[in-house]
Amino acid sequence: MKLNNNSVSSTDLHKITAIRFLSEDVFVLRFDRGGMEFKPGQHIIVGLEEELNQREYSVYSGENEDYLEILVREVPEGNVSLQLKNCKPGDFLQVNGPFGSYGIEKYDLFSKTHIFIASGTGISPFHSFVRSYPGIDYTIFHGVRFNNEAYESEEYDPRRYFLCTSKEGSKDHKGRVTRFLPAFPVKSDMLFYLCGNNNMIYEVSHILRDKSVPAEKILTEVYF
């Protein structure tokens, strides 16, 4: 993820208020907002109180909500995700940020069609977009392995959310996002937002360029 040197950031302690598990290894951590202002698409750096290990997470919640949320996948070799999984309401997080320039420009909000392409927990900033900007024209393509990785898909308009599963059948598309996109009709008013692993972003960007989408209409955020 890129840091935006123009961001106004701070470090503070925020109390955890809730944790909800979406699968065995993916959960949403909710904590006090503490007055933090952010733009949907930005990320914060999170770690436990008095712990040196920290990690970047896109904000999952909407900009008008009175709390902050992050979507976390437990990674076996990831110290921070393992620590966060063991948190309980009442524990404190050290939060630094926000950072980054990834997001939807205000002048594009209702004048463009927004195509969100995510892999795994890369859905996080798009969840924030949809929560923050009711009424925008959007379509989500969410690439996952299994159907149970369609994290809180009920929060999206079912006519606008398409699940692409690589390991099992899906009501939408069986196969990776990159298998479906070549047949997707591109229109001149579309902006493409990519968020997820580096391989997905590289392959999707290549597909879009082959479809004559200008580079300035492809916005990317790499998850690692």
Regions found by a protein language model. Name each.
Residues V8, N79-F224:
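FNR/FR-type flavoprotein reductase catalytic core
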